[in-house]
């Protein structure tokens, strides 16, 4: 048995560099598993998408090929392919993929919100008349002031005469065309 020299304790390095940047963040095994399961669910959502929707999501070639293969495979092979897709997602930044997927999911909600906004603008145009036209022109400079003013006048006459709101619908359609031309 060898004996340790008496000065072996003096060689223990001091922690002179106590930088916060070098701090190791401890992650539990359960948290790693939860993250892996979440990425597998993300992969399953990607596999369930159609080709047109998949084209709108920023994927590299390897991941796209794996997803397309998983769409063709059935039964047990599909499960293994889903595991592979989850593993591929763990090696990549998944945030752009999540954002694109959320955008696809929320497209309907965004469209409904846009329609509500356009309806409110239409109602404001009918109520305030020519005073609200500059606001529309600020939003869409290409808007035709004369056409908008005539539609507003007709909508006011229809409202006063308790007639069907044909011009009101035309104002909404015109505003929707302006909003779509902007996108």
Swiss-Prot record:
Location comes to:
Cytoplasm
Stated name of the protein: Dual-action ribosomal maturation protein DarP
Q: Which GO terms describe its biological process?
A: assembly of large subunit precursor of preribosome
Compositional bias of kind Acidic residues:
7-23
Q: What does this protein do?
A: Member of a network of 50S ribosomal subunit biogenesis factors which assembles along the 30S-50S interface, preventing incorrect 23S rRNA structures from forming. Promotes peptidyl transferase center (PTC) maturation.
Listed A to Z, the keywords are: Cytoplasm, Ribosome biogenesis, RNA-binding, rRNA-binding
One family from Pfam that matches here is DarP
Which family does the UniProt entry place this protein in? Belongs to the DarP family.
Q: Where is this region: Disordered?
A: 1-23
GO MF term list: ribosome binding; rRNA binding
Q: Which organism is it from?
A: Cronobacter sakazakii (strain ATCC BAA-894) (Enterobacter sakazakii)
The major lineage groups are:
Bacteria, Pseudomonadati, Pseudomonadota, Gammaproteobacteria, Enterobacterales
Q: Does the keyword Cytoplasm apply?
A: yes
Q: Which InterPro entries match?
A: DarP, DarP_sf
Q: Which GO terms describe its cellular component?
A: cytosol
Asked if the Swiss-Prot or TrEMBL record annotates the protein with the keyword Cytoplasm, the reply is yes
Assign the protein's first listed, main location to one coarse class. Answer: cytoplasm
